[in-house]
């Protein structure tokens, strides 16, 4: 604690102002990137960007693909420019030669000298250190960078990729630490990339460096989390003394501010022997930056926490805890007993324009044959034995599945699994055949295909239609009622913006307790999970969270 208070004593406004400015520029930049992505995709009638449609975008929409490449390059350049501002600004503060005009002039000169090379290097640094930055500094713009969660989810799909991913990440971290001086040498000394790599490797090879590194890391952790714990303590006191007042939004905003403050203090700790003075004219700027950051974070928190935790529960693919083969009648019969609000299931169109309940676009994994659902008739598909989760059964046609659900008053969340070859026919045939049934029994439809969704809106009310988004790269569409979002890409801002626009946000598929708690703390409308019984328990516990406990969940998982 002595170190922390000593740091406060020596910490001056200049670094805090600089960190605030960098954070605000990054935050605005991310928002502008979303607007640009939305503009590009809307003009080409492309609903979203994913690995599955990337080839289609490149071939059929080259201008959109070019625009997205340009956007990515601009993102790298912006990241490098902000890093340059930070490095030059801190150096100026240390030498008491700070000047805003000089800072921006020099940073632009460096940007012009290294341009894309500097952007790539900074991007690699950001990718490698992002998990630690997320954990230590709860700044608004970092909370919207969900790449860490996406990568973690991807490599966790099986033990081999998990172990391999962890080993690769450890190697990446080691080299990033060894080369941490590359950017400062390039920015401050105009070093070439080769010279900077050699110098950084030489400096970081000694035992004294690693000793200082671990000591600095411990200090940074203590500084950052001591502040967060103080804010949590204030919330605990507020829960006790002022239970009628909801101060969650205020403390959520304080988290954002403290994330920026602790970042500045952490940098200052490395130079405690130097008196850092406040550059002239920064008091008004600092006040404005604090006000803007606090207001934006407060607004997000206010929207997030203004409703109780009571999400719709949805059983993913009709199973609970692997109690059967997904998307089959046998599993439906078992899972209904757990009383989910909805059972999510998937539908493919067959060769004879009928519908089979099935998720995969290839039958190899479930049935052991190399065929697609649209290549076979419904009768042929129903003869297949499918195996999963140590269970074996037959595939179920959609009519039978739907009839059983209606008889037991079980609402369905139906995913329409279209392909590029059948999307239009699929939507028209499905809507004509099942529109009345879906409306009468309050079922919901969702799909990854935007054009399918637009066609369905001609026959089915928007309130029964949801749009699935694997990645959160655009701003909400006005004509979409609800979004299904991959839980690893959920961010507080995305949930808040949609709630402000009176749009619903579902999330899929959090299965661990930690992932479920993240979704609950952000106040999503519905949760799609493979473990609906665990979800019920988690919701009951979350409904008894104090405001401090909910704030802690947001702190840990956002």
Per-range role (PLM):
Residues 324-334, 398, 426, 431, ...:
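Short, acidic/polar
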Residues 316, 335, 346, 381, ...:
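Conserved, mostly hydrophobic/aromatic
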Residues 214, 467-558:
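C-terminal active-site rim and adjoining tail of enzyme catalytic domains
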Residues 317, 345-347, 414-418, 447-449, ...:
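A cross-domain feature marking catalytic cores of carbohydrate-active enzymes
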Residues 312-314, 342-344, 411-413, 442-444, ...:
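Structural preference for beta-strand elements that scaffold enzyme active sites
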Residues 359-463, 556-557:
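Metal-dependent phosphodiesterase/phospholipase catalytic core, i.e.
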Residues 301-375, 379-383, 400-404:
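Membrane-interface segments at or immediately adjacent to transmembrane helices
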Residues 1-313:
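Hydrophobic alpha-helical membrane segments
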């Amino acid at each position: 604690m002595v170190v922390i208070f000593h740091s406060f004593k020596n910490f001056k406004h200049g670094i805090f102002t600089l960190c605030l400015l960098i954070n605000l520029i990054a935050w605005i930049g991310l928002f502008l990137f979303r607007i640009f992505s939305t503009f590009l995709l809307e003009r080409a009638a492309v609903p979203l960007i994913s690995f599955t449609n990337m080839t289609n975008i490149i071939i059929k929409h080259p201008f959109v693909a070019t625009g997205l490449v340009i956007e990515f390059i601009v993102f790298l350049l912006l990241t490098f420019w902000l890093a340059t501002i930070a490095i030059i600004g801190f150096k100026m503060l240390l030498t008491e030669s700070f000047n805003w005009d000089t800072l921006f002039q020099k940073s632009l000169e460096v940007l012009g000298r290294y341009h894309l090379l500097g952007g790539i290097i900074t991007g690699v640094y950001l990718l490698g250190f992002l998990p630690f930055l997320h954990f230590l500094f709860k700044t608004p713009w970092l909370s919207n960078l969900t790449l860490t969660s996406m990568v973690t989810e991807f490599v966790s799909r099986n033990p081999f990729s998990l172990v391999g991913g962890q080993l690769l990440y450890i190697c990446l971290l080691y080299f990033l630490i060894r080369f941490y001086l590359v950017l400062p040498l390039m920015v401050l000394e105009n070093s070439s990339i080769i010279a900077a790599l050699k110098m950084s490797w030489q400096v970081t090879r000694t035992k004294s460096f690693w000793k200082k590194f671990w000591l600095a890391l411990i200090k940074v952790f203590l500084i950052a989390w001591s502040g967060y714990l103080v804010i949590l303590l204030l919330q605990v006191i507020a829960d006790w003394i002022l239970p009628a007042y909801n101060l969650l939004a205020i403390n959520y905003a304080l988290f954002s501010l403290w994330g920026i403050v602790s970042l500045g203090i952490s940098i200052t700790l490395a130079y405690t022997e130097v008196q850092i003075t406040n550059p002239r004219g920064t008091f008004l700027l600092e006040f404005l930056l604090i006000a803007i950051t606090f207001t934006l974070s407060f607004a997000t928190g206010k929207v997030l926490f203004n409703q109780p935790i009571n999400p719709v529960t949805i059983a993913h693919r009709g199973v609970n805890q692997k109690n059967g083969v997904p998307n089959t009648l046998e599993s439906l019969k078992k899972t209904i007993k757990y009383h989910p609000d909805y059972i999510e299931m998937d539908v493919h169109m067959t060769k004879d324009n009928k519908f089979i309940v099935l998720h995969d676009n290839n039958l190899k994994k479930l049935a052991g044959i190399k065929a697609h659902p649209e290549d076979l008739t419904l009768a042929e598909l129903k003869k297949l034995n499918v195996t999963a989760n140590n269970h074996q059964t037959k595939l179920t046609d959609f009519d039978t599945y739907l009839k059983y659900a209606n008889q037991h008053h079980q609402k369905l969340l139906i995913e329409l699994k279209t392909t590029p070859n059948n999307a239009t026919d699929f939507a028209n045939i499905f809507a004509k055949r099942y529109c009345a049934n879906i409306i009468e029994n309050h079922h919901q439809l969702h799909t990854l295909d935007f054009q399918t969704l637009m066609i369905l809106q001609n026959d089915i009310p928007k309130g029964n239609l949801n749009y699935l988004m694997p990645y959160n790269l655009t701003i909400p569409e006005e004509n979409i009622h609800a979004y299904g979002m991959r839980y690893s890409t959920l961010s507080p801002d995305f949930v808040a913006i949609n709630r402000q626009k009176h749009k619903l946000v579902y999330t899929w598929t959090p299965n661990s307790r930690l992932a479920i708690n993240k979704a609950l703390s952000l106040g999503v409308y519905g949760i799609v999970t493979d473990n609906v019984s665990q979800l019920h328990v988690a919701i009951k516990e979350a409904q008894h969270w104090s405001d401090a406990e909910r704030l802690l969940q947001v702190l840990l998982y956002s």
